[in-house]
Each structure stands twice: as structure tokens, then as C-alpha cells.
């Protein structure tokens, strides 16, 4: 969730320091990307499960796990691995498409495109 610019200005004017959680936690660029990927997958799993008309219990049965574990998967809990997130998304009926960069690395950062 992002803060509105109006609220950000009001907090700054009141003397508060406003920033992102990643700044506060001093996450590296790689750690930020990992957190973003985990949260994106977790949100996609919940949306896909709901769109497929599945309960958390039903998705858990497909995965061979419990409803409480599915709840942890859907919030991207730290003890949930990336492969568990991917398995949950596909078990809910989702499909992941990866598109590698078009050309080899040229010293510049390249982007791997992932469509959920």
C-alpha cells in the first residue's frame, strides 16, 4: 500500500521522517526484489484461488497441505519457499510465463519479464 502525497506532506510537515520499510530495514537491491517477488506471488495466489472458486482448504488439499499453511502461503510468510509459492499458484489454476532478456548481458541491468 502506498501513501498518498498529501499524507506524506502532512507527516513531513509535522516533523516525521517518511520512507519505505525497505529503507528502514536497510535491504539491499537484491533483497528488495526478492521481497517484491514473494509479495507479488502471494497476492497472485490469493486472487487466482478466489477466481477459481477454491477455498484455502481446497487449495491445501491440492497441494497436500493444510488450510493454515495456505494462509501462510497467501501472505508470503518467510518460511514459505519460492517453489512453494509457484506450486500454489499453479495448483490454483494459474500459469506463469517467463520471458528472458532478448540479448545477452551488456553490462547493463536486464529485466526478466514474468507474467502471472
PLM feature segments, named:
Residues 75:
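Short, conserved catalytic or interaction motifs in soluble domains
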Residues 7, 37, 41, 69, ...:
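Amphipathic alpha-helical interface surfaces
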Residues 53-72:
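Short alpha-helical DNA-recognition segment
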Residues 82-99:
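DNA major-groove recognition helix of helix-turn-helix/homeodomain DNA-binding modules
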Residues 12-14, 43-58, 87:
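Short basic helix-loop element that most often maps to the first helix and adjoining turn
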Residues 1-40, 103-116:
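N-terminal flexible/basic segments that precede or flank functional cores
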Residues 15-17, 55, 66, 95:
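Short coil/loop linkers at secondary-structure junctions
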